[in-house]
Swiss-Prot record:
Active-site residues annotated for this sequence: 69 (proton acceptor)
GO CC entries: cytoplasm
Gene3D superfamilies: 3.90.950.10
UniProt site positions, description: Important for substrate specificity: 12, 70, 157
Subcellular location per the Swiss-Prot or TrEMBL entry: Cytoplasm
BP term (GO), one: nucleotide metabolic process
Keywords of the record: Cytoplasm, Hydrolase, Nucleotide metabolism
Family classification: Belongs to the Maf family. YhdE subfamily.
Protein name: dTTP/UTP pyrophosphatase
SUPFAM superfamilies cross-referenced by the UniProt entry: ITPase-like (SSF52972)
Species: Lachnoclostridium phytofermentans (strain ATCC 700394 / DSM 18823 / ISDg)
Class of enzymatic activity (EC top level): hydrolase
Reactions performed catalytically: dTTP + H2O = dTMP + diphosphate + H(+); UTP + H2O = UMP + diphosphate + H(+)
Length: 197
């Protein structure tokens, strides 16, 4: 039996794991998220790896550590979490009326009962199309405070859903954890994540 550890404080990621019946604990990595990578897929994979490795040091055996990172990209611009309300407004104006990509990288570190380590890192990409946003809609959304801790300054599963006209790819990638891919990747090691209770 493995202890499953989510190396993230994200309420969305916690919700996804709980939703499918996975029993897990949360151990938040406080490391600074700095990378020299420039491609969105490499950024999210490297940051997910850094988070997972940071937390993995605290566990010896029988543990599955899951690190994840999500960013939004549009025309080679990387959009992380907004620094302030003005920054959120800039991001939302940029995404208004266009299709952008959401990248989520995941690293899974598995430490078995003899302390041997297996590791897998992958990423998923989904596309999101946003309707044309008025200035008033942007300001109302920012006033809700919802955008402030979200990559790209929006939550597809929250109030912003009213402005999302199309999604291509996995919805959970956009929320922050591609659960079906995660399940399949861990299954390759002969482990059923849902049965680890």
């Amino acid at each position: 039996m493995y202890q499953i550890v989510l190396a993230s404080g994200s309420p969305r990621r916690k919700e996804i794991l709980s939703q499918v019946g996975i029993n897990f604990t949360v151990c938040v990595s406080n490391m600074e998220e700095i990378t020299s990578e420039t491609l969105p897929e490499n950024i999210v994979m490297e940051l997910s790896k850094m988070k997972a490795h940071d937390i993995a040091k605290q566990y010896e055996t029988n543990t599955i550590i899951i690190g994840s990172d999500t960013i939004v990209a549009y025309k080679n611009q990387i959009l992380g979490k907004p620094k302030n309300e003005d920054h959120a407004k800039e991001m939302l104006q940029l995404l208004s009326g266009v299709t952008h990509e959401v990248y989520t990288g995941v690293t899974v570190i598995i430490k078995n009962d003899s302390g041997e380590v297996e590791e897998r890192t992958f990423f998923e990409i989904s596309k999101v199309t946003v309707s044309d946003l008025t200035e008033e809609e942007i300001m109302d959304y920012i006033k809700s405070k919802e955008p402030m801790d979200k990559a790209g300054a929006y939550a597809v599963q929250g109030r912003f859903a009213a402005h999302v006209t199309r999604i291509e790819g996995d919805y959970y990638t956009i929320v922050g954890l591609p659960i079906a891919r995660l399940y399949q990747e861990v299954k390759k090691f002969g482990i059923d994540l849902v049965k680890q209770m």
